[in-house]
Structure formats: C-alpha cells, structure tokens
C-alpha cells in the first residue's frame, strides 16, 4: 500500500511539473472571426485586417450579398474562398453553384475587377459545393471558369483602398470561409 501511495505521489509531482513547464509554450488557437454579409454594398461589413473569416449570408436564394475589405497597407492580397455551404440543413451530398465578384471604386464608379485566379484571369470566380466539385470538376483541367470548391483571387491594393466582394449562391442562405493574406 505504501508503494502505491509513493507511486501516486511521484506521478502527481511529475504531472504538476509538466503542466507548469508546458504552459508558456502553448500557442493560443484563434478561431475564425464571423461576419455577416449585407445585400447593400454601402452597408456591408468592412474587414480591415488579414486573417480567416467565416462569412454568413442571410439573403434568400438567388440574391447577391456583399462584404468589404480595406487594405491596411499597399501590396498584393490573396483572397481564398472555400467551404461554401447552406446555413441550415447542410448535407455533404448537396450540389450548389455560385459566383464571387470583386469590385473596386474607380473614377468612373464601381468597377468589376479582373483578378488572377486558379487557371488564369477572370472577372467571375465560379464556385461550387464539395459534392458538385467531386462529381463534375475533379480530375479535369482547371480553367479560370471551372467550378471549384476552393478558389483564390490575387489583387493589388493601395493603403486604404476598398474592394467590394459580392457573392451569389444557388442554395440560398449560406456561409463560406474567406482567408485574406
């Protein structure tokens, strides 16, 4: 019995020491920030930092919605869109399509931008659900107009310049992941 108590005490001391030593080396996990898109581009949420965002779209089926991004400094930015899905009742077998458009204010008004993306340059970023991609696109040559589950857009911006990101999704209310770097 004494051996068991000594063993338990030794184990407790070792575990306590490990906990105390490992705590300073832990990296905090940062969850994706959630933002809600708006059907009015002028009232859309304005993202001002790089990072990963979960964007919620509460507009009805076949309606556009917007978010904005204002560049914190001059440079090339990569926007990665992925994991498009319905907000409620999502099943992995659903097949939906959508589009992403990027607009910038110019001296002539708001203008759609041609951006570098998977497979070339395009004004329209065609996106789809994972099931659609697996059934119809996977294994084919990727073109700028291909329906992809994950798609990037590269754009050069000046400090303080704002882009408007418009999405359209056939599944109605939806969400997606947006990574800005």
Regions found by a protein language model. Give the residues of each.
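Surface-exposed loop/turn motifs at beta-strand-loop junctions within extracellular Ig-like
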Residues: 24, 83, 169-171
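A short beta-strand element within beta-rich, extracytoplasmic domains
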Residues: 76-86
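Sec-dependent N-terminal signal peptides of Gram-positive bacterial secreted proteins and lipoproteins
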Residues: 1-27
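Signal that preferentially marks extracellular ectodomain short beta-strand elements
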Residues: 140-155
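Non-catalytic extracellular/lumenal accessory regions of secreted precursors
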Residues: 26-68, 74, 118-120, 130-131, ...
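Noncatalytic modules at the cell exterior or secretory-pathway interfaces
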Residues: 75-76, 154-170
